[in-house]
Amino acid sequence: MNNKPWITIMLTSKCNNYCSHCYINYDGEWDVSEVVECINDLKGTYNINLDGAEILTKPEYLSLFPLVDQHHLMTNGKAIYENPSLIDLLKQNGITDVSISYHYGIHDEVSSFRSSCVEQTIELLLSSNFNVTVMTMLNKKNFLLIPDICDFFVSFGIKKVMFANYICQGKNKDRNSILDKNEVNCALNSIHSMRQKYESSDFYVSRTGAFGFDSMHGCNLCCDAGTEGFVILPNRKVCPCVFLCENNFFIGEYAKGCDFLSCSTFAHDFYSCFALENLNYCTDK
């Protein structure tokens, strides 16, 4: 991978599912032609990642993926479950890796797309030869289940899990669900244990940076929000991170030829997660 900074274009706020923990905190969607113009403007200077609330609410967006050489897609899986012919469209546009949400232990509590349907969708993706990563959010109700979560996914034939920390953003306003620092450390210990248990080539145990720096086991976390990583919303507002899409965190507004590196004055401790510290741990929230 080159050393160019990253731009994530959030294509849409639309979703076909209801999740009580949804972090999306913006509205609107891009026209495909406008995204093409934005990609052509930025791709020489930045690596570009395409994301959204649920990209498959507008399958035309898939035509954009070859333009940025992106082979992975994040989804809740519902559109694929309801319309399996999307499998062919994914392949036609170069998608080889699919990350799908499955919040083991709490899924049917937090998502209207039932866990049994998610499992059927995962089976379809695996049988269609996609590399499947399961995205699992951890809160107070399931953070102690990490060993069970890993064992279940291994038995299912999944090769990778990505654990995400509950961040108090968007619909995530239940502060009683937030993991405190001791619970985060407990989760990190369990993740480390699972990495010791499984060969990474057989089952890769990963986690997002939203747990913060792991001082117990060492890690290479470097939060690049607003310095080497930026997010453009459908309304063209520029944010440092997908979890920091609200007014007090805006960096500016996208315009053709905009140099985010020179216009950003966003400063923070690179060795901690800015969203975690300011949305979960900040006592002013």
Task: Pin down the residues of each PLM region.
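Conserved alpha-helical substructure of the radical SAM core
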Residues: 1-93
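Short coil/loop residues immediately preceding or within conserved phosphate-binding loops
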Residues: 6, 226-227
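Hydrophobic faces of well-ordered beta-strands that scaffold small-molecule active sites
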Residues: 7-9, 48-50, 71-75, 98-100, ...
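Short cysteine clusters
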Residues: 15, 19-22, 223, 241, ...
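Radical SAM enzyme [4Fe-4S]-AdoMet core and its adjacent flexible, acidic
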Residues: 30, 103-225, 234, 238-239
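Glycine-enriched alpha-helix->loop->beta-strand junction motifs that scaffold or abut catalytic
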Residues: 92-97, 157-160
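Flexible mid-to-C-terminal extensions adjoining Fe-S/redox cofactors in radical SAM and related proteins
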Residues: 235-285
